[in-house]
Design a protein with these regions (language model features):
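Single conserved hydrophobic/aromatic residue that forms the stacking wall/gate
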Residues: 1-5, 9
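Active-site loop and adjoining helix of the penicillin-binding protein/serine DD-peptidase-beta-lactamase fold
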Residues: 6, 18-19
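Conserved small-residue packing positions in alpha-helical repeats and bundles
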Residues: 14-15
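Non-catalytic C-terminal accessory modules of carbohydrate-active enzymes
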Residues: 20, 25-136
Length: 136
């Protein structure tokens, strides 16, 4: 686990495994990498947690996937986003909102946890896109 956590490239696999096990909140500890990049005023992604310069490594851009698909929870449920599933992994976050660009238009999703920890989800879908969660 420490090997996977320390190797930035392997985090994509660690994040998916934690998500599938229902332990996505454990990824919060690994967010320091991206916070450090912002604090160091880097304009591209680092290769490892110990780097203080950006080398433009695509695998460190994992957050570009995590935010819309996992934190917001917006994923296609059919080819080309004909149907969409919205299932956020909230972790330790209290709220999130954002827009996801799809071939069919912009999807807006936002959620917030209340004092009782209940999740309140609001979304807008482009014309012709169905919400798939109701089928489950």
């Amino acid at each position: 686990s420490s090997s996977a956590a320390s190797d930035v490239y392997k985090r994509q696999y660690l994040f998916r495994a934690l998500e599938r096990c229902g332990w996505y909140e454990k990824t919060d500890d690994l967010g320091k990498t991206w916070r450090q990049m912002v604090e160091n005023h880097l304009t591209t992604c680092v290769e490892s947690d110990t780097d203080t310069r950006s080398d433009c490594h695509a695998w460190e851009a994992l957050l570009c996937y995590e935010l819309p698909a996992v934190i917001l929870g917006v994923r296609p449920a059919a080819l080309g986003f004909q149907k969409v599933r919205i299932e956020p992994q909230v972790g330790t976050f209290r709220e999130a909102s954002g827009d996801v660009i799809t071939p069919r238009g912009l999807i807006h999703a936002e959620w917030k946890r209340d004092e009782e920890n209940a999740l309140h989800l609001h979304y807008t879908l482009p014309d012709g896109v169905a919400y798939a969660n109701e089928e489950v």
